Every structure is written in structure tokens, then in C-alpha cells.
Amino acid sequence: MNIKAIAKEVLEFLIYLIIMVAAVIALRHFVVESFRVDGHSMDYTLQHDERLFMWKLAKIERFDVVVIKAPSDPSKRYIKRVIGVPGDTIEVRDDKLYLNGVATDEPYLAEKVKEYQAANPNGNFTQNFTLAQVAGASTVPEGKYFVLGDNRQNSLDGRSFGFIDANTVEGEADVSYWPLNRLEIGRAHV
């Protein structure tokens, strides 16, 4: 091989490398990003230090687990479950979620609620509330969501900070990849 042929191969390799790096950066910035769970507000579904992929282009729906900018400090991020979408009325009464007046199952909490009720027959895993009591409005406004942590007794969520703006949702967290024993697609969506 002559020097020209080697230089051509090196240049081709560098071009491919630059394209690959640019593609990875674009994917991370616009499509998917890794996220580490920091804290216990989603215990029972997600664990502290668990690693997830966050899909930035996902259409957010009720019960999705999402990464949001913290209302009090946008440089921080929280992970919560979307409970209310625009137009919803929400109430929790005697550990039952009522969406638009209809009792709605929360399978992601069922086991923990049973355990809690067995140990605390006169207590509620989730304290009773209405949307009006905690957020100051009876329905979720357009362009907003109402979010809760799955660890209802230890979560800074919509009961404290009210509605979140839809534009503060960074993406849906739906694929757990670390630790490997928790590797699963869609588990957070249960």
C-alpha cells in the first residue's frame, strides 16, 4: 500500500467515526438518555440508583413513569408517575384512586397497599385528598399533568407542588437496564 491509499483509508475511518459520534450525540440529546433514580419516591416500582432509559419523544399518557424538571429547582430532576392528564378530576379516598369519578386500579401499588393495610388496619397507604385540596383546581388544566411518586408516604410530588407544566417533562422512563437483575422493558409502565 502506498501512502495515498493509507491516507484515504484513515480519512474514511475518521469520517465514519465523526458521523457515529454525531449520531450518538444527536440520539442522546433528542431521542434517548440514560437516567439514574436518585431517592426513594418511586420505591416498589423503581429502586434508588437503578438506571433507566428515558425516551424523549414519547407521547405522555396517564400512568407513564416520567422524568421531570423539579418545580423548585429546574437543574434537578425527579421521577414520578403521571396520574392526571388535562381534563381529569382526581381524588384518593380510602386507598382508592378515583379518576373522573371512577374507581381506578393501581396495580403497581396493589401489593404494598395490602401489606400496609394488614399492618395498619386503620390507616391509609395514600392519605385521602382531592385535586382541589392539593393543587387548587378541581381539574387538571390544559398543558399540565398531575404526578405522584409510587412511594406515597415518602414522595415530594403533586400533593406538595401541584401541577407540572407539560414542557417540564423530559421523557418517559420505561426501560430499566441496571442492575442487570432488574433488566426489563416496560416494567415501570405496569
Q: Which residue ranges define each predicted feature?
A:
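Soluble "head" domains of membrane/secretory-pathway proteins
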Residues: 2-10, 30, 48-187
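Hydrophobic, membrane-facing alpha-helical anchors
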Residues: 10-11, 36
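Hydrophobic membrane-insertion alpha-helices, especially the h-region
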Residues: 12-30
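Aromatic-capped interface at the extracytoplasmic side
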Residues: 24-42
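Membrane-proximal juxtamembrane linkers immediately C-terminal to transmembrane helices
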Residues: 43-47
